Amino acid sequence: MRNLLLIGLFLIPTLASAQRNNGKGMIYLDENRRPVLRENIMIPAVNGFEVLKCDFHTHTVFSDGHVWPNVRNQEAWQEGLDALAITDHIEYTPHKEDVNVAHNRGYALLVESAKMSNILLVKGSEITRNTPPGHFNAIFTGDASGYTEDRSGEQDRSAVMKAAAQNAFIFWNHHGWQPGIEGSYEWIDLVEDLYKSKALHGIEVINGFGIHLKALDWCIDKGLTVMASSDMHNLVAHEYDRSKDYVHRTMTLVMAEDRTPEAIREALDAGRTVAWASKYLAGKEEHVRALFGACVHLLPSHYTEVKANGNKTNWYEIRNNSDLYFELELKEGNGTRHVVLYPRAAQLISAPAGTTSLTYDVTSTYVRSDTHLSVVLPLK
């Protein structure tokens, strides 16, 4: 009872400070408001590069999204993103009877608020062709008012080339989203033509809640940049279960020289990216390996357990110094078989004394459609 009374006494000044009374019969319940704060996504530098959190595929009411552009900026700030692109559809604008659709307008409305929020705003559009070939995102674009709205197949190439003529970074979107249409998930002639013409620079390997594994192989085999995006139309909070610590919108991790649009573009051109979707990472092996190595550290053995039969087991602490999530399955050696590294957390693993290393597959990663990152943990 004493503890309850103490708690009650402590609450009295808290409630008094949360409520504002203007002395004229009005009480403001400020304690019921959502706190104004920005998440801080912790990912250490990788090989000297900053890891920037970027979403280059989102929508607003200026195409088929459900929100005004400023909401996208607010969400990006709250969720700890570094860079954002509004990529409203060029050829598909179902709200045009209610909204004065202009292809540059969503970006224009955000320029000042993004600067104030310290969000790097990248200009972009979604070139929305029929499937196949499907949709292409163009970012780092110029004036989009002259982009092609005609969706006929004869205009497919020219629609993309208008963005290419502006030196845009172009990536192919969500290939498996219409599996019932023949050619929707194939490397078709038009895509080969764009690729050879250097008008295709990346592929969206993860779109929202779907991983397109064949697209990862294409990126690796053809030297294209691995991309991941939310493709958000609704509110992020309506789509993602943010009650789980590891859940967040799908995004591209960009390993950039600094936090500027120019550095992001250079990194995209160089292919220094990893796709991130809550528990899962996908990318070229060199980048996924470097990211894992920057985040995960195995400490020297801190304890040797001596069994009744005289056998000795060494214990180690393995730490995850990031907000990423890793699952490991033992492949070679005699030691702890399954390890889950939660964000900013550590686990204990063990191995018989004398064991020099353990080899794990990081099953929460993909470096090809059928391959997880393999890591060797040296034991000291």
What is the predicted role of each segment?
Residues 8-17:
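Hydrophobic h-region of N-terminal signal peptides that target proteins for export
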Residues 19-54, 73, 133-141, 183-380:
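Charged catalytic cores and adjacent phosphate/nucleic-acid-binding surfaces used
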Residues 28, 33-173, 179, 205, ...:
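A metal-dependent hydrolase metal-coordination microenvironment
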